Amino acid sequence: MKKYVMALDQGTTSSRAILFDYEGKIVATSQKEFTQIYPKAGWVEHDPMEIWGTQSGVAREVLERMAISPQDIAAIGITNQRETTIVWDKNTGKPVYNAIVWQCRRTAAICDELKTQGMADYIRENTGLVLDAYFSGTKIKWILDHVEGAKEKAEKGELLFGTVDSWLIWNLTRGKVHVTDYSNASRTMLYNIKQLKWDDKILKALEIPKSMLPEVKESSAIYGYTDHQTFGGADIPIAGAAGDQQAALFGQGCFKEGMGKNTYGTGCFMLMNTGDQFVQSKNGLLTTLAWGIDGKVEYALEGSIFVAGASVQWLRDELKIIRDAEDTEYLAKKVPNSNGVYVVPAFTGMGAPYWDMYARGAIVGLTRGAKAEHIIRATLESIAYQTRDVLEAMEQDSGIQLKSLKVDGGAAMNNFLMQFQADILSVPVDRPKITETTALGAAYLAGLAVGFWKDKNEIESKWSVDTVFEPGMDHEEKERLYKGWKRAVNRALKWEEENELDVK
């Protein structure tokens, strides 16, 4: 009997490998950060070879550290930063350009051009996404247009595109398998999530040859086996894949319509399961595929907040007013409130429900009495306010009122933030015992495909709560604070656009 399932969690700032046992408990974990490349303002890249190097490295390391044989691994599940775009040469396996990361804004002008062609409504109605630089489609076009010879090679069928899951599976199988899953495909802005196929009209508008695209499969299925050289001769089935947020929804056991979770990572991502219903948002949310499993797909509504944990990194690395992310909880509690200060961390624009590529960060409400602690507290509070923005939009779209919010991700360990979140939402916030739900979701998807776990009911029974944060704030106080947030956001919207007009 095989004892473990390995999750490869390829994130925005690090690659991790986590081993789970049958109970869904973490046995071992290994992590390695990699380089963030910022060639110009608003541009973000990663080196695809470094993504593969760090990811394969931690996978081997986690086995070696625990002296576990690769033969004991029942399956590998992959979860990944979504939308990040890699184009590589089919014959050499070498990328033709760096990975263009989901946060990168370089293709805003391509999006504007598509809008003038009248593509925005078509894209929203068929891919569930808003026309934005965030998604893979325009990033592929940028690579084909700007890398010498890329367009010609693509037309000859010599280039392949993949999101990070595809790139890892391609490398794990030494180029034998070029696939993605429904959840990742639904983030490319090229996939028709009603018809479940690549959309010819969008491909034509972006001049992307279909031959570049991976085959789309269920999120829980055996895609292929690890190449002999990867894990010392072991043929481990690669049996699950899902974009990080959909994987977290699965790992949290949100299998029923109306169940939702928020992941507090670099960005913040809130998803609500809408079952087999494609719910078209009227409030700037995305409609996305949650997963494909057991021969059918399920949909979700998603609100993306671009900057959450990244604003805490900014306090640490740029402002240098904290030494460690963990310090924020203690420092935020040193003051009774934010002293009227609001931080709007729109460093790369604003996501749902605003979708403003030209918004920029702002700190408002400063007085002479504003201290570092107030700015730290206001930064944490901004994460909770943005979550409320998204939740209100979700409830309006779906007609479902959330009873409680399941939370995970690094910042979910911050008790101050979780309590403030419950207060500002007026719903209980449930933090599970295992907060590594993204990796857990990938492990569950892979384990189900190979029979390591029987079905979703068995998985659901393993979810257990660690802490419930009950709302306790006075209604008037809560609404007063939230109104102030809305005023602060209005100061930050359209900032860059106005700046460009001034220059002209």
Curated annotation (Swiss-Prot):
<feature type="binding site">
    <location>
        <position position="82"/>
    </location>
    <ligand>
        <name>glycerol</name>
    </ligand>
</feature>
<comment type="subunit">
    <text>Homotetramer and homodimer (in equilibrium).</text>
</comment>
<keyword id="KW-0808">Transferase</keyword>
<feature type="binding site">
    <location>
        <position position="244"/>
    </location>
    <ligand>
        <name>sn-glycerol 3-phosphate</name>
    </ligand>
</feature>
<feature type="binding site">
    <location>
        <position position="309"/>
    </location>
    <ligand>
        <name>ADP</name>
    </ligand>
</feature>
<comment type="similarity">
    <text>Belongs to the FGGY kinase family.</text>
</comment>
<dbReference type="InterPro" id="IPR005999">
    <property type="entry name" value="Glycerol_kin"/>
</dbReference>
<feature type="binding site">
    <location>
        <position position="83"/>
    </location>
    <ligand>
        <name>sn-glycerol 3-phosphate</name>
    </ligand>
</feature>
<feature type="binding site">
    <location>
        <position position="82"/>
    </location>
    <ligand>
        <name>sn-glycerol 3-phosphate</name>
    </ligand>
</feature>
<dbReference type="Pfam" id="PF00370">
    <property type="entry name" value="FGGY_N"/>
</dbReference>
<protein>
    <recommendedName>
        <fullName>Glycerol kinase</fullName>
        <ecNumber>2.7.1.30</ecNumber>
    </recommendedName>
</protein>
<feature type="binding site">
    <location>
        <position position="12"/>
    </location>
    <ligand>
        <name>sn-glycerol 3-phosphate</name>
    </ligand>
</feature>
<dbReference type="GO" id="GO:0006071">
    <property type="term" value="P:glycerol metabolic process"/>
</dbReference>
<feature type="binding site">
    <location>
        <position position="245"/>
    </location>
    <ligand>
        <name>glycerol</name>
    </ligand>
</feature>
<dbReference type="Pfam" id="PF02782">
    <property type="entry name" value="FGGY_C"/>
</dbReference>
<keyword id="KW-0418">Kinase</keyword>
<dbReference type="GO" id="GO:0006072">
    <property type="term" value="P:glycerol-3-phosphate metabolic process"/>
</dbReference>
<dbReference type="InterPro" id="IPR018483">
    <property type="entry name" value="Carb_kinase_FGGY_CS"/>
</dbReference>
<feature type="binding site">
    <location>
        <position position="410"/>
    </location>
    <ligand>
        <name>ADP</name>
    </ligand>
</feature>
<feature type="binding site">
    <location>
        <position position="13"/>
    </location>
    <ligand>
        <name>ATP</name>
    </ligand>
</feature>
<keyword id="KW-0319">Glycerol metabolism</keyword>
<feature type="binding site">
    <location>
        <position position="244"/>
    </location>
    <ligand>
        <name>glycerol</name>
    </ligand>
</feature>
<feature type="binding site">
    <location>
        <position position="309"/>
    </location>
    <ligand>
        <name>ATP</name>
    </ligand>
</feature>
<feature type="binding site">
    <location>
        <position position="266"/>
    </location>
    <ligand>
        <name>ADP</name>
    </ligand>
</feature>
<feature type="binding site">
    <location>
        <position position="134"/>
    </location>
    <ligand>
        <name>glycerol</name>
    </ligand>
</feature>
<feature type="binding site">
    <location>
        <position position="410"/>
    </location>
    <ligand>
        <name>ATP</name>
    </ligand>
</feature>
<feature type="binding site">
    <location>
        <position position="12"/>
    </location>
    <ligand>
        <name>ATP</name>
    </ligand>
</feature>
<dbReference type="GO" id="GO:0005524">
    <property type="term" value="F:ATP binding"/>
</dbReference>
<dbReference type="InterPro" id="IPR018484">
    <property type="entry name" value="FGGY_N"/>
</dbReference>
<feature type="binding site">
    <location>
        <position position="134"/>
    </location>
    <ligand>
        <name>sn-glycerol 3-phosphate</name>
    </ligand>
</feature>
<feature type="binding site">
    <location>
        <position position="12"/>
    </location>
    <ligand>
        <name>ADP</name>
    </ligand>
</feature>
<feature type="binding site">
    <location>
        <position position="266"/>
    </location>
    <ligand>
        <name>ATP</name>
    </ligand>
</feature>
<dbReference type="GO" id="GO:0019563">
    <property type="term" value="P:glycerol catabolic process"/>
</dbReference>
<comment type="pathway">
    <text>Polyol metabolism; glycerol degradation via glycerol kinase pathway; sn-glycerol 3-phosphate from glycerol: step 1/1.</text>
</comment>
<dbReference type="GO" id="GO:0004370">
    <property type="term" value="F:glycerol kinase activity"/>
</dbReference>
<keyword id="KW-0547">Nucleotide-binding</keyword>
<feature type="binding site">
    <location>
        <position position="16"/>
    </location>
    <ligand>
        <name>ADP</name>
    </ligand>
</feature>
<dbReference type="InterPro" id="IPR043129">
    <property type="entry name" value="ATPase_NBD"/>
</dbReference>
<feature type="binding site">
    <location>
        <position position="414"/>
    </location>
    <ligand>
        <name>ADP</name>
    </ligand>
</feature>
<dbReference type="InterPro" id="IPR000577">
    <property type="entry name" value="Carb_kinase_FGGY"/>
</dbReference>
<keyword id="KW-0067">ATP-binding</keyword>
<comment type="function">
    <text>Key enzyme in the regulation of glycerol uptake and metabolism. Catalyzes the phosphorylation of glycerol to yield sn-glycerol 3-phosphate.</text>
</comment>
